[in-house]
Amino acid sequence: MGPDSTPAEILTETCTIAMIGASPDPAKPSYGVMEYLMAQGYKVIPVRPGEGEILGMPIVNSLAGIDEPIHMVDVFRRSEAAPDIAREAVAAGAISLWLQPGCVSDEARGIATSAGLAFAQDICTKQVHRDQSVGPIGPSLLP
């Protein structure tokens, strides 16, 4: 996976997702996407301020607080936050950065792709997964 990967390829090569802006509110889009991705076999780690759990997964306050490989950083935040999140994703060793609908940043794209990360923006992980019939086949799922 690299800067030229398609959204479907990113999802296929992803197992662990750090979801920035995950919400414990079932009415929020991030909650529904997290629930869907977990049901499809992805491990989704909610990243947000505070403590507790979302869908049984403990909340982590930053990417730096995750002590396992991060395949994708999935972002439910405003576009203005994307460049700093891209820098954090690079520093955390993430393989891809995905900005959800409404989040668009050429600066974040440049930061991510120049560091070799795959990148998608202004598109929903749940929608791509459903439309492309892809699923995780990353390293943790291979024999």
Role assignments for model-derived ranges:
Residues I17-A18:
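Conserved beta-strand elements of the Class I
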